[in-house]
């Protein structure tokens, strides 16, 4: 999710260097707290005899519209257009107060860097990758549809379910509407430079009401390299929140994705379109005694969304997401998803929201019936336990406060 917050400055210092030249530094605390009630249908339950059934659930969800988190961001003006900066960002669970990832204090970002006003900024540490930065702005889940409205399991990482560890990242300044960036994650394994290595490239062009972006992402051993063997906040594809049917899908030798998107502002309306192609190579989800190496699977995802601002405080929005999943040498499964939402800003920092998400799966089916082993269509709204059928619905209402 994107990180646009109005923070509170804790410290501002001016240190004399020589004559009238001063270095100014600041440290800012910023973040958000988000919570809401979620009603969902058909959450799968495994019975004692191995069969599955479904039930409705009412839950308290935290970090829905925007992940609940806090951050310390610092900058220092070194003069001559050069600035040093850092960001340390922690995500937590609103319902329990626990960290999202045990043992990882700054699980979202931990980086330091230098920026030049003429060229751009180079940063080092754990951080969001360039592909997700440039393309994620066109996904409804990053503005109003909540993380539950993201693409299937956030398989294309537009919601930044996984970040890059041990990464170097460059982001350019605006050159007449053109910006670009790249991220390189060092795997750090002796004797195997490619192990857990990742990189991404992206560019964007903005002119008046029109915005266009394109990017590419490559990550080896994504489950271990970016997620540490556990899930990012989207969840169930990596078994974080429950024993989901799609566990181990991201346990693959590599993940490669590319995409393009754009948006246009027309009076009070904003229209956006984004397309991504993601391929997981040798996914262990498809492994068997006869095929221990796993099988490749690709996802072609297209999203069209629209937001209409009735007033500066009140918006209505809708999105349609189509996802075609194809197993190498095999069959296809299609996921259709509709997101509907409304937001009302009580102030610059506080907003109320209500979102409804419906998903339907069709085709051969990516799910596996635990009792029979046959392929079935199991819908799964991101961050929920997968459905016991080809349909699932979620409705939520909550409040988000930025600080």
Where are these regions (language model features)?
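Outer membrane beta-barrel
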Residues: 24-39, 57-187, 195-199, 204-217, ...
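Bacterial N-terminal signal peptides
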Residues: 9-18
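Bacterial N-terminal signal peptides that target proteins for export
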Residues: 1-8
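Extracellular loop and loop/strand-boundary signature of outer-membrane beta-barrel proteins
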Residues: 54-58, 98, 155, 187-188, ...
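Gram-negative outer-membrane beta-barrel proteins
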Residues: 37-45, 92-98, 130-134, 188-192, ...
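Detector for outer-membrane/organellar transmembrane beta-barrel domains
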Residues: 202-341, 357, 390
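Sec/Tat signal peptide C-region and signal peptidase I cleavage site
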Residues: 19-23
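Outer-membrane beta-barrel "beta-signal"
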Residues: 346, 387-403
């Amino acid at each position: 999710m994107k990180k646009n917050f109005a923070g509170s400055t804790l410290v501002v210092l001016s240190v004399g260097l020589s004559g009238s030249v001063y270095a100014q530094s600041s440290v800012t605390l910023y973040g958000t707290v988000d919570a809401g009630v979620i009603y969902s249908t058909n959450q799968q339950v495994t019975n004692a005899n191995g069969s599955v059934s479904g039930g409705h659930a009412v839950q308290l969800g935290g970090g829905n519209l925007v992940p609940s988190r806090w951050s310390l961001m610092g900058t220092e003006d070194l003069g001559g257009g050069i600035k040093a900066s850092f960001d340390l960002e922690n995500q937590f669970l609103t319902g329990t107060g626990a960290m999202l990832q045990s043992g990882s204090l700054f699980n979202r970002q931990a980086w330091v860097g230098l920026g030049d006003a003429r060229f751009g900024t180079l940063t080092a540490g754990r951080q969001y990758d360039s592909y997700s930065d440039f393309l994620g702005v066109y996904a409804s889940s990053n503005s109003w549809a909540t993380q539950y409205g993201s693409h299937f399991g956030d398989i294309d990482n537009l919601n930044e379910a996984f970040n890059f560890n041990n990464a170097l990242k460059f982001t350019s300044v605006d050159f007449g509407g053109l910006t670009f960036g790249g991220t390189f994650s060092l795997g750090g394994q002796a004797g195997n430079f490619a192990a857990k290595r990742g990189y991404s490239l992206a560019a964007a062009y903005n002119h008046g009401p029109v915005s266009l972006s394109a990017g590419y992402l490559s990550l080896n051993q994504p489950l271990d390299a970016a997620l540490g063997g556990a899930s990012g906040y989207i969840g169930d594809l990596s078994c974080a929140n429950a024993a989901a049917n799609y566990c181990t899908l991201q346990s693959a030798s590599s993940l490669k994705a590319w995409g393009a998107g754009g948006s246009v502002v027309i009076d009070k309306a904003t229209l956006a379109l984004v397309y991504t192609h993601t391929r997981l190579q040798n996914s262990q989800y498809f492994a068997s005694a006869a095929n221990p190496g796993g099988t490749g699977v690709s996802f072609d995802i297209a999203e069209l969304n629209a937001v209409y601002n009735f007033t500066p405080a009140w918006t209505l929005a809708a999105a349609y997401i189509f996802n075609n999943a194809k197993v190498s040498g095999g069959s296809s499964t299609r996921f259709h998803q509709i997101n509907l939402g409304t937001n009302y800003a009580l102030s610059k920092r506080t907003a109320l929201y209500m979102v409804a998400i419906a998903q339907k799966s069709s085709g051969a089916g990516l799910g596996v019936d635990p009792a029979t082993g046959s392929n079935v269509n199991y819908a799964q709204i991101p961050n929920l336990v997968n459905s016991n059928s080809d349909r699932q619905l979620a409705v939520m209402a909550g409040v988000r406060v930025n600080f």
